[in-house]
């Protein structure tokens, strides 16, 4: 839709009549001016363009540079009719400053014209922040505006110091922030090509820019780039690494660039691998404290491929294992505390001890409950690790805290209750004893009504009675579901499959299915590994031939499904 022109001037007046200042202010500040218009021609010939307003000190040039309908063509007309580009208004900002920080779609040619009209060299203190403010404006205000490579080159060639600091930042700090935010969801920024970004950074370096300059928080530009959540592009990051930023500089929080990335709340596996590889190739072996911190901080963070990343880190840093502690906690403690189920699963596969206590005697379950920031995932994470908990005292302690657990999904909570009743024989009896207590009832008021809670427990308990009455060979279905030994459960596999389809079990069907699948896959992979290693077991030169096959099966059952899978299908090395 075309804009309607606003006419505020009477161009038919006699040339001897004075144009009022408020007319000029309105005209240049708010009107959509056509550079070929009779109006503009009338104004530039009949008005002193360098007359300053009493309060603001603005001239016609200042007013037009703040006009939302700014065009390069009108600015050229003003420059050709002798506007003074050196006049400072009360704000203290020179016209070239306003042009570079306020105007959109500015032409490199008008920038050169304005600079050439000013005889002062750009190295003068009045212009020292010009390049920094130009790039800063594209980062903070004019987000859809491009950073013109030619303008950057001209400003640097004219003597602007690329290392000038304002509020601790250099122009490169702001440029790296622009590069990071281009990829941030919802920013709607103009894309910056990698080739262009590389040329601009090269221009800075050619003019003596310090690539590792520190801001007030001790961050280099590369620190800032890596710390922006959800915005790092692998190809852009790879390009920035070609300038060999210093990986050993710690900011005021003790974080190197890699640690800034690890703590950014969003990690791409490929970028993590690239950063570590670059460090080890160009710097050398990473200090043990930094390695430890990388692994522990990674577990707290969202990542695109958590299993791949934790496997890579554990294999890369050989002196960090499941027993390593940082601030009194093992890797598994941190994984539980931050509800990182992918990492929990991996660490338990490689024999991490879920029942180990922290240095201040806290169990993993307590760490999950205490982390209020992740309260919406508390129940799901507790459900996830309950399959690994066998200590009855730990389960009883968890049951005692049930009234205080945050409930966001009633189905997950119901499943959680069913696990607790299955694993703790005393749960239902203790609940019945306290049922009439007002204090006990009141503790449930925050997340769920007591009646709802009581009905869930009653339903679960009634179904456990049915489990106890259901015979499975020489035992009951109740005992089978409480058993964690997949070797023992193998003999009940076919019965579990039958009960798995039994519609009479509405609450415990999920647990039956989990038990069945766990035993099924364990048995399947044990058989695969046994068949694969059979030539070894039967080789007369091998001492394993002395062992009965039953013992070999027992040994294989000690391995996790993950281990058995990797033996059956070894990962291919690229």
From Swiss-Prot:
PROSITE patterns: ANK_REP_REGION, ANK_REPEAT, FBOX. It holds the Pfam family Ank. Keywords: ANK repeat, Repeat. InterPro entries: Ank_repeat_dom-contain_49, Ankyrin_rpt, Ankyrin_rpt-contain_sf, F-box_dom, PRANC_domain. Residues 541-574 form the F-box domain. It comes from the Viruses. ANK repeats lie at residues 56-87, 135-164, 167-213, 217-249, 253-285, 327-356. Signal peptide: none annotated. This is Ankyrin repeat protein B18.
């Amino acid at each position: 839709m075309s804009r309607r022109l606003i006419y505020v001037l009477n161009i038919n007046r006699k040339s001897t009549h004075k144009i009022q200042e408020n007319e000029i202010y309105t005209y240049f500040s708010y009107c959509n001016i056509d550079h070929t218009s009779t109006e503009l021609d009338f104004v530039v010939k009949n008005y002193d363009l360098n007359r300053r307003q009493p309060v603001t000190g603005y001239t016609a040039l200042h007013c037009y540079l703040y006009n939302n309908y700014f065009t390069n063509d009108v600015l050229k007309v003003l420059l050709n009719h002798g506007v003074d580009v050196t006049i400072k208004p009360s704000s203290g900002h020179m016209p070239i400053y306003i042009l570079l920080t306020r105007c959109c779609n500015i032409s490199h040619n008008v920038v050169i014209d304005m600079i050439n009209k000013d005889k002062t060299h750009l190295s003068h203190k009045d212009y020292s922040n010009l390049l920094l403010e130009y790039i800063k404006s594209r980062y903070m205000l004019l987000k859809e505006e491009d950073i013109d490579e030619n303008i950057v080159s001209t400003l640097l060639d004219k003597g602007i110091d690329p290392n000038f600091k304002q509020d601790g930042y250099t122009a490169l700090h702001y440029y790296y922030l622009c590069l990071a935010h281009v990829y941030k969801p919802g920013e709607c920024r103009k894309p910056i090509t990698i080739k262009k970004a590389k040329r601009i950074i090269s221009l800075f370096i050619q003019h003596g820019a310090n690539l590792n300059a520190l801001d007030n928080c001790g961050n280099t530009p590369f620190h800032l780039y890596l710390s922006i959540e959800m915005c790092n592009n692998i190809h852009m990051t790879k390009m920035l690494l070609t300038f060999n930023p210093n990986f050993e500089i710690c900011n005021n929080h003790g974080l190197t660039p890699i640690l800034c990335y690890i703590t950014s709340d969003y990690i791409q596996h490929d970028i993590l691998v690239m950063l570590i590889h670059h460090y080890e190739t160009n710097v050398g072996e990473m200090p043990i404290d930094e390695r430890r911190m990388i692994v522990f901080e990674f577990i707290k963070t969202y990542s695109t491929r958590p299993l791949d990343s934790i496997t890579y880190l554990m294999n890369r840093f050989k002196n960090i294992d499941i027993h390593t502690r940082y601030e009194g906690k093992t890797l598994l403690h941190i994984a539980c505390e931050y509800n990182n189920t992918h990492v929990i699963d991996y660490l338990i596969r490689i024999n991490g001890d879920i029942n180990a206590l922290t240095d201040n005697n806290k169990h993993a379950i307590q760490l999950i409950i205490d982390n209020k920031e992740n309260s919406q995932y508390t129940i799901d994470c507790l459900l996830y690790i309950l399959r690994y908990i066998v200590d009855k005292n730990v389960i009883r302690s968890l049951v005692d805290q049930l009234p205080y657990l945050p409930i966001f999904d009633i189905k997950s909570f119901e499943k959680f209750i069913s696990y607790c009743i299955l694993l703790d024989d005393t749960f239902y009896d203790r609940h019945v004893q306290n049922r009439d207590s007002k204090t006990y009832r009141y503790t449930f008021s925050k997340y769920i009504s007591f009646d709802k809670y009581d009905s869930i427990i009653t339903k679960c308990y009634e179904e456990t009675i049915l489990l106890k009455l259901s015979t499975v060979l020489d035992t009951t279905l109740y005992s089978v579901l409480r058993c964690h030994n997949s070797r023992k459960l193998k003999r009940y596999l076919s019965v579990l499959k039958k009960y798995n389809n039994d519609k009479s079990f509405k609450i415990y069907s999920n647990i039956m299915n989990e038990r069945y699948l766990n035993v099924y896959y364990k048995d399947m992979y044990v058989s695969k590994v046994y068949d694969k290693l059979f030539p070894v077991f039967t080789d007369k030169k091998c001492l394993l031939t002395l062992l009965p096959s039953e013992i070999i099966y027992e040994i294989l059952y000690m391995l996790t499904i993950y281990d058995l899978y990797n033996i059956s299908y070894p990962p291919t090395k690229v």
